[in-house]
Amino acid sequence: MLKITIITLGNKMPDWVNSGVNEYAKRFHDGIQIKLIEIPLLRRNKSSDLARILEKESALTKDALPANARLIALDMLGKSFSSEELALKLTQLQQISSHLCFIIGGPEGLSNEILTLCDERWSLSKLTLPHPLVRIILLESLYRAWSIINNHPYHK
């Protein structure tokens, strides 16, 4: 069984975000287990020390990292994939690890400390995406790749 953990900074998402995440998570069949870990964003204002906030959020993220998982940071500068390339990549990763952990940063992205810990960096787009929407895009992309691997008609 493939385990997919998604660690994301930010909680208290709007209903439409939770609905989108739940919709794609339930589409995966018994062979894949999806787990979402939400880390609350620290309070920000105009006078906030963003470096200090990022450091604290990084510590919370590190504490949430599952042992023995392949860590994949979602980062604008990461590698991007077509749907077919992502299907091939997932097939290859399943040979390496039975647990993939995707990390979604907050408004400032991920700290260098977290990026350094990760085995890979992936990009979903060259666009700057709101981090709540990234959850849905990631799960849809993974589901599409899964459907390609399994010859499911979703991708067609």
Swiss-Prot record:
Q: What is its EC number?
A: 2.1.1.177
Highest taxon, organism lineage: Bacteria
SUPFAM superfamilies xrefs: alpha/beta knot
Drop me one GO molecular function for this one: rRNA (pseudouridine-N3-)-methyltransferase activity
What Pfam families is this protein classified in? SPOUT_MTase
Q: Per the record, what are the reactions this protein catalyses?
A: pseudouridine(1915) in 23S rRNA + S-adenosyl-L-methionine = N(3)-methylpseudouridine(1915) in 23S rRNA + S-adenosyl-L-homocysteine + H(+)
Which keywords fit this entry according to its UniProt record? Cytoplasm, Methyltransferase, rRNA processing, S-adenosyl-L-methionine, Transferase
Principal location class: cytoplasm
**How would you summarize the oligomeric state and partners of this protein?**
Homodimer.
**Primary role:** Specifically methylates the pseudouridine at position 1915 (m3Psi1915) in 23S rRNA.
Q: Write down what this protein is called.
A: Ribosomal RNA large subunit methyltransferase H
Name the lineage: Bacteria, Pseudomonadati, Pseudomonadota, Gammaproteobacteria, Legionellales
